[in-house]
Amino acid sequence: MNKKVYVGMSGGVDSSVSAALLKEKGYDVVGVFIKVWQPDFVECTWKEDRLDAMRVAAILDIPFITLDLEKEYKQGVIDYMIEEYKKGRTPNPDVMCNREVKFGAFFRWVKEQDGDAYVATGHYAKHNGTSLVVSTDQNKDQTYFLWTLSKDVLPWVMFPVGAIEKSEVRLLAEKFNLPVATKKDSQGLCFVGTIDIKTLLKQYIHEKEGYVLDEKGDVIGSHTGVMFYTLGERHGFTITKKNIDDAPYFVVSKDFENNTLTVSHNPVRESSGEIISLTSCNWTVDVEKGKTYEARGRYRAPLVKVVCSTPTSFKILENDFVATPGQSLVVYDGDICVGGGIID
């Protein structure tokens, strides 16, 4: 076998093991480290990550390339995120990173190098050639972040660790003598790392103090701007009128026009029967009107039953579903991820 595969290598254990597995299977593997934009007010981490990726490539004896996609990342992920927050919405930058960078600019670059080459990443996901499939390690499944992958792209994508448990991936890293075998998983914003998103946003969006209201409409505190908060959040605002048991408050609604947050002690919502409208939908399987599916509105949130009203709207059949504008509603039919859209 001499099929060429370009592996997006972040310097982490998942992408490193992905490259090792493909090399072991006889593929012609090329490691690619994607350099993206990082704000100048945070610690630079990409050089260390690239060095880890280079070490792995050297051990595997595969070519290694650094691909500069700073412009594409800044425009497609960071600028998009800032504009969405300015509108009072809560975007998911990891979804945009996959759409615009990993399976956008990177995918197109690979095809320019070799039209028959594949793209591989260290995502925990599988696919059947046309649709995403939930990964073997369901606790690590990342199909929620990958719903934008189209039927044209999927046949050219490989997820080598998608059929493996995370614990086994660590063992494989040791077997291949990879220097990242014990490296911690990355956290935080896609590529950028552990930066606090509010810290990033406040470099671009001015704070605007406003009132925090209880469910009766009484003023009980203050906040620094509704655009910095998301539904269900319980931190970052100040409560001046505390209750006796000091129970936590959760954001249950945002009034962007009046710059007020409404909070409640009860995060559970009566969402059954609510219709969720979507934009920017991508379906790899045509969704059927009247059919019941399962869906989640944020990463790791429990799956809830939904009914397809139209290809751009779904009726929620259960309570405790928080529909956050800007987040993704990702729809499943069993273990098949049929696609999703952005909550309007």
Which residue stretches match the model-derived regions?
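ATP-dependent adenylation/nucleotidyltransferase module used to activate substrates
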Residues: 1-147, 158, 167-168, 174, ...
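AMP-forming adenylation/ATP pyrophosphatase catalytic core
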Residues: 120-126, 132-344
